[in-house]
Regions:
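Histidine- and acidic-residue-rich, metal-dependent catalytic cores
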Residues: 1-170
Length: 170
């Protein structure tokens, strides 16, 4: 894992392995190309976001590997796996709106800085909520910092209240 960044081919292969073809147009080149383009755009956005942050560089791709492995082990449906992979890539896109100085801190955040950091969840959802995803990506993104015991954020969900994909990411 370390500094390993998925190549475009590796990322596309992982996402294609989770893709469930549309019943009416199974194998349609247009659908496959559309999903492939979406993945490439997401990969560019994630790469731009992580470009200037040594602490975050490659973290989304490492998280994709781990979340994908857990989803595979849980034998989730292909659509659920795709949702988890997409949410994993997009979950921290709202960090673009958080002060860069905050990311320079090493160790535990003060409570004020922790409150500032929490804003990335609503920022991520805010940036993405106008997109009519064909998958349940936003609930996973919104709840990826919830904790099974209810001590997480933003809503303090616990146990089965937390979407499965968000539980995997948390």
């Amino acid at each position: 894992i370390g500094d390993h960044r998925l190549s475009d081919a590796e990322l596309l292969a992982l996402l294609r392995s989770t893709q469930e073809p549309a019943p009416a147009e199974a194998g349609s080149p247009a659908i496959d190309k559309g999903v492939e383009c979406l993945i490439q755009v997401i990969d560019v956005l994630v790469g731009l976001q992580e470009l200037n942050s040594a602490s975050f560089r490659g973290s989304s791709h490492r998280a994709v590997h781990l979340a994908g492995a857990v989803a595979e082990r849980m034998d989730l449906l292909p659509t659920e796996k795709l949702e988890i992979v997409l949410a994993t890539l997009l979950k921290d896109i709202g960090n673009a709106g958080v002060s860069e100085a905050l990311f320079e801190d090493v160790g535990t955040f003060s409570s004020d800085k922790h409150e500032m950091m929490k804003q990335h969840v609503s920022a991520s959802v805010g940036l993405l909520e106008h997109i009519d995803f064909n998958w349940k990506v936003l609930p996973i993104i919104r709840h990826h910092h919830e904790r099974y015991d209810g001590t997480g954020y933003p809503d303090g969900f616990k146990g089965p209240e937390i979407p499965v994909g968000a539980r995997i990411l948390a």
